[in-house]
């Protein structure tokens, strides 16, 4: 049995022949066809629409049963085309109606949601139209036109926005799923991390407090030692400095205080009573420090005795000033504080200058004051004793009998 090849030609092949054998862009150039040996298939033979079942059977004998005992069904061209057309037309009509209805519903849903949201918002804001006039109808028409344009756009670009909605929904679902899985892990990791942080922070704070306490103790110790050394060095320096320099420093301080009191007296500066008292206190303290360094006073007892001595002198002056003001019947106001300040300041200045010229005069003054007070008290005591003896002698003379007086007179 010889293999016969029946060339299959369709309307597409004829159209290709008429168009000068145009090349299919998907398949590429046509392969060479050798009709003698039949080894090469005709061009694009697998994509031919074979409508004749007889030719299909001739090319492939196994496609249909050619047994003589069995009568093959009659696949006529009319019967095949009629059946295929009926099935295809009925399925296409049903699918097109369903897809059109689905497309219309899905395109109308966004417009419906938009209008419902707008009505709810306007109702909440109490901005719905109450009286439909010209402007209201214009606004309503523009709104309807906008909704119609949106509906047409959704209808025309149905596939695009449906795909976008599907992709967005899938993405949101994945995000929610990932978030639901990831959040417990994050919470667990965060809780563990916070617990570790709290533990580490507590340990670190305890160590910091301990180190800070030790450091502060060392700082206080070093500061106390440094201050003691500074005071000692300053005291030795002041003790070794020339006496003229100390006098110049005190004179400068005296000039500053005099200028200050002069400004207060003139009225250019409105200082209160506390300023004068503080100035006097500063002068007294400065006098005490300088005099203590120059004497010098190195022990606490001598420092306290010198301070009490200066304060005692100031107290005596204050009592005398207050007593004199009270005797003259004047109120102790601004004038009294001013007088007291001047007296205290100049007293401190005089004592300082006197101490600088004659070192140890305060100590001798204390002894001299005690001796003078003792001498005054002794003189007063002697005077009282003499007065007492005089009164006692007068009383003895009054107690003599009259007879003895006559005898003494005769003798």
Curated annotation (Swiss-Prot):
Residues 1-95 are annotated as: Disordered. One of its GO terms (biological process) is meiotic drive. Residues 11-29 have a biased composition (Basic and acidic residues). Residues 57-72 have a biased composition (Polar residues). Keywords: Cytoplasm, Endoplasmic reticulum, Membrane, Toxin, Transmembrane, Transmembrane helix, Vacuole. The chain crosses the membrane at residues 104-124, 137-157, 244-264, 281-301, 303-323, 336-356. Pfam families: WTF (PF03303). The keyword Endoplasmic reticulum applies. InterPro entries: WTF. Belongs to the WTF family. Promotes unequal transmission of alleles from the parental zygote to progeny spores by acting as poison/antidote system where the poison and antidote proteins are produced from the same locus; the poison component is trans-acting and targets all spores within an ascus whereas the antidote component is spore-specific, leading to poisoning of all progeny that do not inherit the allele. This is Meiotic driver wtf33. It comes from Schizosaccharomyces kambucha (Fission yeast).
